[in-house]
Regions:
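N-terminal beta-strand motif that seeds the catalytic metal site of vicinal oxygen chelate
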Residues: 1-16, 70, 127-129
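Long, continuous compositionally biased terminal/linker segments
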Residues: 38-82
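Core segments of cupin and vicinal oxygen chelate
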Residues: 8-52
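Short glycine-enriched loop/turn motifs at secondary-structure junctions
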Residues: 1, 63-66, 105
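Residue-level structural signal for beta-strand termini and adjacent loop
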Residues: 36, 60-61, 100, 126
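Vicinal oxygen chelate
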Residues: 10-14, 71-116
Length: 129
């Protein structure tokens, strides 16, 4: 059910070098970097994995407060939409309405909310429509 997770870091370059070194023995490598130019946000992100990025680090914001991001797999885009509406109805704050995020890949359809404790929770579907 967990698709990927990520957290904020205080020094992106230092953490990038650290995780490249410590994840390599586990067979994990750097799969993707997301730059401010790709997203329009002032943050860098690095996704590590075995072919698919499922372990993410990123800068931007306060790394010591509510820096957790968890993405849950959805079976289809309708489930992503339903997750988003249910989360808002339950008191979550919007952090990205359902939609394509083609800077990750062409079929990446996700929605983001901030839970009551400030964590960034996402539902994502990777299947084509």
């Amino acid at each position: 059910m967990i698709d990927h997770l990520g957290f904020r870091v205080t020094d992106y370059a230092r953490s990038l070098a650290f995780y490249k070194a410590v994840l390599a023995p586990l067979g994990y490598g750097l799969v993707m970097e997301v730059t401010p130019e790709m997203t329009g946000k002032d943050a860098h992100h690095a996704g590590f994995g075995k072919g698919k990025p499922d372990f993410w680090i990123g800068n931007g914001g306060d790394a010591t407060r509510n820096g957790l991001h968890v993405a849950l797999q959805a079976p289809d885009r309708a489930a992503v939409d339903a997750f988003y509406q249910a989360a808002l109805a339950a008191g979550a704050r919007d952090n990205g309405a359902p939609g394509l995020r083609s800077h990750y890949h062409p079929n990446y359809y996700g929605a983001f909310v901030i839970d009551p404790d400030g964590h960034n929770i996402e539902a994502v579907c990777h299947a084509p429509e």
